[in-house]
Structure formats: structure tokens, C-alpha cells
């Protein structure tokens, strides 16, 4: 009856909203995905209860000044083209409160035009999330669990809500890949229009995604080429991670790169050290090895100086600096991205330029990776390559550790690397070939 309804309204919904927005102000007013969930919950509760003050707190922050709250989060957590600063894994995660609350705002207060706010940033963010994937799986840089894909609750909701707003037939292509939609009016529209054959291929493309609220804190470069795979996207993708740190979930991997080809991750990123929701593995939380290995520079395809991680492994320091994106071109025939950073190590400037040329008569993809480090002092430079596959051959003499298994170092990730074999290169040159899924890959290096 009415008494029960009032009791639930007052003792469940209002009490929870009060706890989140007035007793937990430090979390509620953060510019962070934790606050996005809190503001979305309070705002949607406000709409349910007809409480305009609650909605205002959610949109504008606990003091309703606009310096915090949901609207401010859309302005500071995404770059102008919809890249979320923590990376694709958390972009997927945060899209749920962003889009579900935005959908509620649109239903209750269409005059706010939330989907037009900041030049349509939330719809850009949804499309950018899809662009940051290969065969449906997100590029696993920063803290990322590698088996998260477009087939997740956040993206079922997000694709349906975005389609309801835009009627973009490319989103139907993604919904078809997902194989399901959600029980809401926009979900019914997705199913109906898919059945009517209105889907068009999603435009996977080479693109430069700026980082930072003003787009001036580095970038993520995505270079795509080759004939389309089963998912309708180019078969070869190179990612250059020239972005900002991405707060606490960021890794120390400035100017790192990854490569996908032939349906597989070839030059790989470890992602996060975590068994999500597995109670026996530290309650499903991040493992200690996330700090000691997964975040370390040597765990990535980046230049490591003096066996230490970028910024000394200090996330607060790293948040203050980012690479400078020097050049980007998606011109057919020669795609290129170039960036530099002089703050990852004191007194060391690093520039990296990956190129993807298309050469007549060469069927397989080719990547040229130019790395230059300069310093007034002598340093040890290590350039790891983490790849997927089985080693076939190499053109240098190795000294194999068959009786014992030493480790490479004592700290900064090096303590986790076993030395299987070592070699001295002839004139700084060498080549190594491995096989993955019926295709050979050769890495040639010269210094």
C-alpha cells in the first residue's frame, strides 16, 4: 500500500541517495568513474521520486556549483573525440552509468539535450569504444582484463541507447555481432531494424584519438590496413600508446605499441594481473603482481632506461606529464604516427615513429619501428618485444640456461623475467622469426 511505498521511498531510496551525495561527498564529487556510478544512481533516484533537488545534486555536484557532478564528468573524463582517459577497459565499464543516466535525463528532461552536450560527447564515446577493439575484444592496455569484449552488459545497453538516439545503421552491425539486445524501447527498435536488414558495416578506421579534456595530453594512434576480416574490419591494426597516464589504472608504458594481424594479437600487451570475481585469487581484486609486473615498463613494448619504470613507477608524478604527438597520417600507402617524451626519465628524450607502408608485390603487412633516445649521460637502454607464438629461428648464437633459471633483475618488473637464453649481437643486428596461427612473423632489429 501507500505506507509501504512511502517507507521504501524514505528508508531505502532517500537514505541511499543521502549517503552517496551528502555523507560521501569526497567520492561523489570526484572526477572519476566511481563518482559517475554514484551520480547516476542518485540522479535516477531523483527522477523516480520526483525530487528535483536530488537530480540537481547529481548533475552539478553536491553543492550544485557545476564544478563536480555528472555534467562535469562528461567534460573532464573524455577527450573531445570521446577517448576516456583510463583506457578502453574502463571506458567500457564507465559507459553504463554515463549512457543509462543520460537516457533517463533525455526521457525526463529532454530540454537539457544531454546527448547534444559538449558536441555529442557521450555518443562519440560509444563509437570510440567500438573503434578501440579488434574482432570484438578491447585493446588491453592499462589495467584491462583481456577477455572483455563488445559482448558485455555495458555495450548491450550502450549500443541500444545510442541507436535509439541516432538510428545509425552501423550500430546495428555491432548489435548483430553482439547477438542480443536489451529489454527497452530502443532495444526493441534495434531488433526490429536488424530484422528489416538495415545494418551497415561499422566504419573501423585509422584514427588519432586525443587524450585529456582539451585534447592536448597526448593521444592513442590506431593504424588499420588490409582486407576485411570476418568482423568487417581491416585485418592488420597497429596501436601506438602515446597517451596520458590515465590515473591509477594507467601503466608505465609511454610510446608503447601493439600489433594485431590475421585475427590474432601479435605484439601483445599483458593487461592486468587480476582474476575478476575469483574469490581464491585475493578476492577477485587486483593482485600484487599488478604493481610489481603488469604496470612496469619492462612488461610493455616500450623503451626502458636503467632497468627502471617510467616516472620511477610513481603514478601521481606520471599524471602530470604526457607525450607530444608530433605527426599522424592515415594516408593510403604510408600510414605513420610519431611522438616523443622527455619527462619519463630525467635527462632522457625518447622519440618513436612506427610506420605501416603498403609495398607493391608484398602481400604480408610490414611495420617499421624507429626509436631514438638521446641523453647527455650514459644509460642502459632495453627495448622489449612481447609477442604471441612459437619461436622458429634466429640468426644469432645463444647461450642457453639449461641447468638453472636466473632472473633478469631485482626490481621494477625485471624480477619476474626468467633468462631462458642470451646472445651477443653481431654489429647490433639480428632477426627472430616466430609462428602463430599458420603465419610466420620476423622481427629484424638494428642499433
Report each predicted region and the residues it spans:
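Aromatic-lined, polymer-binding surfaces characteristic
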Residues: 1-130
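A short, hydrophobic secondary-structure junction motif
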Residues: 13-22, 127-133, 293-306, 371-380, ...
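Short coil/turn segments at secondary-structure boundaries
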Residues: 30-33, 139-145, 317-319
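Secondary-structure transition/capping motifs at alpha-helix termini
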Residues: 51-54, 104-112, 135, 228-231, ...
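C-terminal, helix-dominated tail/subdomain
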Residues: 113-191
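Catalytic and substrate-binding regions of extracellular carbohydrate-active enzymes
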Residues: 172-404, 408
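Polysaccharide-binding surfaces and accessory modules of carbohydrate-active proteins
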Residues: 378, 386-447
